[in-house]
């Protein structure tokens, strides 16, 4: 029983100590700007001044129009990449994700290549780039 009581008393003292020192100290109340300047560790003159500029409706509309133009140009560029003609397929070829060991013919997909793993024991046709 004495060991249990000693353990509980130690735990209680530790919790009181932890509770007392975990709270931040109360802040000093500053009376005026002079005490603020003398007590502050950061000098306010070190930071550049901030200027606030009001935006009018025209500037907002221009920025929206520019954003829409950028979006449409990106879509057109991606469409141009997709619309590229592909080479005609040869009859004896290996489908994507099928085995393509050295006696096998080339991959059917022009964007795919034969990729081997485990010291060339397991080979398969895989598409490496999506933008092909």
Curated annotation (Swiss-Prot):
GO process terms (BP): hormone-mediated signaling pathway; melanin biosynthetic process; melanosome organization
Family matches, as Gene3D superfamilies: Agouti domain (4.10.760.10)
Recorded coiled-coil stretches: none
Its job: Involved in the regulation of melanogenesis. The binding of ASP to MC1R precludes alpha-MSH initiated signaling and thus blocks production of cAMP, leading to a down-regulation of eumelanogenesis (brown/black pigment) and thus increasing synthesis of pheomelanin (yellow/red pigment).
Organism expressing this protein natively: Macaca nigra
Domain Agouti: 93-132
Stretches the record annotates as Disordered: 61-87
Cystine pairs: 93-108, 100-114, 107-125, 111-132, 116-123
Domain observations: The presence of a 'disulfide through disulfide knot' structurally defines this protein as a knottin.
Assigned GO CC terms: extracellular space
Domain of life according to the entry: Eukaryota
Glycosylation sites: 39
Signal peptide: 1-22
Keywords: Disulfide bond, Glycoprotein, Knottin, Secreted, Signal
Compartment annotation: Secreted
GO terms for MF: melanocortin receptor binding; neuropeptide hormone activity
Record field: compositional bias (Basic and acidic residues): 63-79
Protein name: Agouti-signaling protein
Phylogenetic placement of the source organism: Eukaryota, Metazoa, Chordata, Craniata, Vertebrata
């Amino acid at each position: 029983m004495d060991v249990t009581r000693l353990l509980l008393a130690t735990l209680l003292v530790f919790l009181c100590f932890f509770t007392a020192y975990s709270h931040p100290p109360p802040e000093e109340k500053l009376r005026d700007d002079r005490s603020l300047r003398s007590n502050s560790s950061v000098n306010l003159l070190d930071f550049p001044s901030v200027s606030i500029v009001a935006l009018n409706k025209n500037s907002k509309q221009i920025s929206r129009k520019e954003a829409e133009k950028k979006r449409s140009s990106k879509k057109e560029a991606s469409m141009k990449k997709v619309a590229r003609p592909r080479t005609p397929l040869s009859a004896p070829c290996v489908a994507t994700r099928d085995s393509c060991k050295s006696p096998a013919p080339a991959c059917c997909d022009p964007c795919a290549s034969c990729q081997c793993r485990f010291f060339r024991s397991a080979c398969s046709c895989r598409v490496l780039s999506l933008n092909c």
